[in-house]
């Protein structure tokens, strides 16, 4: 089956709320994470910033997994700027430069209609090619909070994951409660109005992936963790046939006791795949800590691994390639 890997980049002001996102060394640096992730897939290191994105504790971006899988399986990557502060310095499709707003103060995405329309056009063009399957990953700091807000607005009793082992669930819930109060809604009130949930609480990545999936009528693999549950819930509410969709994530998301990944996927009615990578024997603490609940998923890591496995590589080979790439990065650091 001919597949293409699409990386959708998104930013939301929610990532600037202290304590919400560890998808960057500081809240301010989360603005650079999406373009830097995209660049790292094409270069030895990002160009927009002189290092790969890390958590505040220094754990490497999951883009390293996506890059490893691609080095093995050689699948094509298309970068799509759904809505970011900065454009990546790689060839990409521009959908919008709209950044999701802080939904505690105002609706998150007044531009959602235009973003969905533009992304749908791209999906329709891809549908005209011989490509039979889109594997869509994302890089969106703060996106698990917008995802949980959208899921709650639509009546799902979901808890999303986090790139930190200490999921800031109570902070997320406080932020969401303030957003619901501002919008004048209660949980579940928008279950029949998915686009209003997207407008009030979503982010440009979600709108872009929804549009792509509406335009491309063949198989779609949503390569992500709990953020892709929100996308799935939106697609289901838009009466899409869920049998052509699958979520591909990592075992670290599935194992996350602070989240409800499997339960919510079942409630939505979408099948899931979890990449069985193992970094426990890595020589690098930054990678070993993935086994302790750091990072977990992002940049389509689970979906990219799934593509490598479909191409005949084993999870062990992907893990070994990640190790090799991380060693190369460490070697580039000045002593």
UniProtKB/Swiss-Prot annotation:
Q: What is this protein's name?
A: UPF0284 protein TK0853
* Gene Ontology molecular function: nicotinate-nucleotide-dimethylbenzimidazole phosphoribosyltransferase activity
Q: Which SUPFAM superfamilies match?
A: Nicotinate mononucleotide:5,6-dimethylbenzimidazole phosphoribosyltransferase (CobT) (SSF52733)
Check the record and name the HAMAP family matching this protein.
UPF0284
Family recorded in the similarity comment:
Belongs to the UPF0284 family.
List, alphabetically, the NCBIfam families matched: nicotinate mononucleotide-dependent phosphoribosyltransferase CobT, PRK04447.1-1, PRK04447.1-5
**What species does this protein belong to?**
Thermococcus kodakarensis (strain ATCC BAA-918 / JCM 12380 / KOD1)
The cross-references to InterPro entries, in alphabetical order and at most eight, read:
Nict_dMeBzImd_PRibTrfase (IPR003200), Nict_dMeBzImd_PRibTrfase_arc (IPR002805), Nict_dMeBzImd_PRibTrfase_sf (IPR036087)
Extract the coiled-coil ranges from the record. none
CDD domains the UniProt entry points to: DMB-PRT_CobT
